[in-house]
């Protein structure tokens, strides 16, 4: 059941962090002219999927006289294409697509001063997303194929209680 009314056809979409790749890396300042090529080279070295099968984006997040620090994000084309097809079929226009942990990071950076490094751990039902923010920018992301459901099952087994009771214990006691 929907609460309220959707008044805009433009939407932002988050992709599961487990389906995306994000990484920061440093390059000599002279490389900035060929930044796109350097980012693709980094993707080829770091990501186990050919760069031709990825949508890759990047942002310079830090600059000194000698070097630049770049944040690269990449998602398999098939993942993005399927999402866009579904969203457009529903009558919406995607204007932003980003890893879900990046969305959480942006919210935290907007609400915090960002002066201390921060670790974000987003525990979902089936997976856990992790990001490290430093100076208001995501530096590293990762994910685990373990989420809240795993914890609930473990509690149920260890305490020999029903899943519903295990879930309540997890929520109430952490």
What are the roles of these predicted feature ranges?
Residues 78-104, 137-174:
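Glycine-rich phosphate-binding loop plus the immediately following alpha-helix
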Residues 1, 10-16, 66, 109-141, ...:
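Gly/Thr-rich phosphate-binding beta-strand-loop-beta motif of the actin/hexokinase/Hsp70
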Residues 10-112:
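Active-site neighborhood for divalent-cation/phosphate handling
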Residues 1-10, 90, 161:
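Phosphate/pyrophosphate-binding loops at sites that engage ATP/ADP/AMP, CoA/4′-phosphopantetheine
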């Amino acid at each position: 059941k929907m609460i309220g009314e959707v008044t805009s056809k433009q939407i932002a979409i988050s992709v599961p962090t487990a389906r995306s790749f994000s990484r920061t890396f440093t390059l000599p300042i002279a490389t900035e002219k060929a930044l796109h090529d350097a980012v693709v080279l980094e993707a080829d070295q770091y990501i186990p999927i050919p760069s031709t099968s990825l949508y890759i984006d990047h942002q310079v997040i830090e600059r000194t006289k000698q070097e630049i620090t770049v944040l690269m994000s990449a998602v398999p084309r098939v993942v993005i294409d399927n999402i866009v097809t579904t969203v457009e079929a529903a009558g919406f226009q995607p204007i932003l697509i980003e890893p879900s942990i990046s969305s959480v990071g942006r919210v935290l950076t907007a609400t915090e001063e960002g002066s201390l490094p921060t670790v974000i751990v987003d525990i979902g039902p089936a997976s856990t997303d992790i990001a490290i923010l430093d100076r208001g920018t995501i530096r590293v992301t990762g994910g685990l194929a373990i989420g809240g459901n795993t914890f609930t099952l473990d509690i149920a087994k260890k305490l020999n209680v029903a899943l519903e009771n295990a879930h309540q214990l997890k929520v109430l006691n952490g």
